[in-house]
């Protein structure tokens, strides 16, 4: 569901940053903002979200954002839809390089995924949201979840078993024996 504005933003205007010392930050969104972030990411719950680090100069024009992301997320189990709680603790590094050309093709493979072109404004809140999104378990599963498998088949036919699906040519010999011998 697209939004006009992200649920959390903490911008740093690059031109206003001190050129010789790091700018430290400690972002802890409040309950309302955390609820908005959880809704934006499709989470059941989000607690203890914290993004702490610094934005420091690297050379004459480049910048490095280095931070630690901490959060406790609650997602729905992919099997039972029961709540699954996961603790996230991830280091985050982004390097902003002046003069880095934006790739023009629709899909481009970047050699280093932490390198980005230097924008006029570095949004630590957007970096936090991106890092949280990437750190989420893609298929959360409750400890007691048991996936017995799907048993789907056309009407009047028996569903395939695991043995039948792992041995696709198992019935080939029987079919050849039933044949009339003509080739």
Residue ranges of model-derived segments:
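Charged, alpha-helix-enriched surfaces in structured cytosolic catalytic cores
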Residues: 28, 32, 68, 72-75, ...
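Helix-adjacent hinge/juxtasegments
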Residues: 64, 68-105
């Amino acid at each position: 569901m697209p939004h006009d504005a992200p649920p959390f933003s903490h911008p740093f205007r690059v031109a206003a940053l001190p050129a010789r010392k790091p700018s430290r930050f400690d972002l802890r969104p409040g309950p309302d903002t955390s609820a908005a972030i959880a809704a934006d990411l499709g989470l059941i719950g989000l607690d203890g979200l914290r993004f702490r680090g610094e934005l420091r100069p690297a050379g004459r024009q480049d910048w490095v954002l280095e931070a630690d992301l901490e959060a406790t997320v609650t997602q729905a189990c992919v099997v039972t839809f029961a709540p699954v709680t996961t603790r996230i603790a991830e280091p985050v590094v982004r390097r902003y390089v002046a003069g880095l050309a934006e790739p023009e093709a629709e899909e481009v493979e970047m050699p280093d995924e932490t390198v980005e072109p230097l924008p006029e404004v570095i949004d630590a809140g957007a970096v936090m949201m991106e890092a949280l999104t990437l750190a989420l378990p893609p298929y959360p599963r409750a400890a007691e979840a048991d996936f017995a498998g799907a048993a789907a088949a056309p009407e009047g036919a028996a569903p395939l078993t695991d043995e039948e699906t792992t041995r696709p040519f198992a019935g080939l010999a029987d079919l050849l024996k039933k044949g009339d011998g003509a080739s």
